[in-house]
Amino acid sequence: MTVLLTGGTGRTAKHIAGIFRQTNVPFLVASRSSSAGTAENHRKFDWLDEETFPNALSVDQGMKPISVVWLCPPPLYDLATPVIKFIDFAVSQNVKKFVLLSASVIQKGGPAMGKIHEHLDSIKDVTYTVLRPTWFMENFSTKGEIQCEAIRRDSTVYSATENGKIPFISVVDIARVAACALTAETLKNSDHILQGPDLLTYDEVAQALTGVLGRKITHTKMTEGELAEKLMEEGVTPEEAYMHAAMDSMIKSGSEERVVSDEVKAWTGVKPRGFINFALSEKAAWRARK
């Protein structure tokens, strides 16, 4: 068995790769460019260039063929189209198993990853698992992410969620579940909502960060329109800005509170990390204010 990880320079794939190195699972990483720690396993791959598709599935001498693919869709407005094209190519090369990274609010047949989910479900003799994590904790700590820069620069977090709650999850836990799914003997054509253990409002996130950092962090509450404008000011495309703001409004109405999931422990046998644990480990990300 050889696993192909798309989105190879992304946060989740990096953690999956680390797990596979420790457990000696053969894998390749597909992305436009390599990164530290993945160069020896790298295959040049571009979702928008079908000529790179064969290269992504090419294995080194002595390796078994690719048998399962981690699908991490690209950050495109019409992300489903290129991913579906690659799935169809992979199936033509006898790949029969896929694990898709989707999102908690996106069901089969919905927009974006929902279309990919629906397509996987329609292919005869293909088995799959869809992972639907809620919002990433690491959005608060990754350099360049709007929330991270807002904490560093302005000591605030922005949202249009009002008092809506989110069970934020760490990329580390998503990767652990993904590694289990990618190495499972069988996949059951199922989807799984992944959540962290703490159901938090953004007010509570700000309060937790205040305690960890020793300086006041606030929650700047906005309307959906105000948040979209703020995101565009920070360089986000209009399509992404309006989509993100609309998702905040869904959170405001309770979209992330309706399902309680213990899938992380069910898959891995270990409870997911809590927000305070995450914040303590990432303090350095918020220390410098520029």
Swiss-Prot record:
Q: What is its EC number?
A: 1.5.1.46
Q: What class of enzyme is it?
A: oxidoreductase
**Which Pfam families would you find in this protein's record?**
NmrA (PF05368)
What GO biological process, any one, is recorded here?
indole alkaloid biosynthetic process
Q: Could you state a single Gene Ontology molecular function term?
A: oxidoreductase activity
Instruction: Tell me the superkingdom of the source.
Output: Eukaryota
Which pathway features in its UniProt record? Alkaloid biosynthesis; ergot alkaloid biosynthesis
Q: Does the keyword Nucleotide-binding apply?
A: no
Q: Does the keyword Oxidoreductase apply?
A: yes
Q: Keywords, A to Z?
A: Alkaloid metabolism, NADP, Oxidoreductase
Reaction catalysis annotation: agroclavine + NADP(+) = didehydroagroclavine + NADPH + H(+)
Cysteine pairings via disulfide bonds: none
Q: Which family does it belong to?
A: Belongs to the fgaFS/easG family.
Q: Self-association or partners: how does it assemble?
A: Monomer.
Q: What does this protein do?
A: Agroclavine dehydrogenase; part of the gene cluster that mediates the biosynthesis of fungal ergot alkaloid. DmaW catalyzes the first step of ergot alkaloid biosynthesis by condensing dimethylallyl diphosphate (DMAP) and tryptophan to form 4-dimethylallyl-L-tryptophan. The second step is catalyzed by the methyltransferase easF that methylates 4-dimethylallyl-L-tryptophan in the presence of S-adenosyl-L-methionine, resulting in the formation of 4-dimethylallyl-L-abrine.
What name does UniProt use for this protein? Agroclavine dehydrogenase
Q: What is the lineage of its organism?
A: Eukaryota, Fungi, Dikarya, Ascomycota, Pezizomycotina
Q: Which gene encodes it?
A: easG
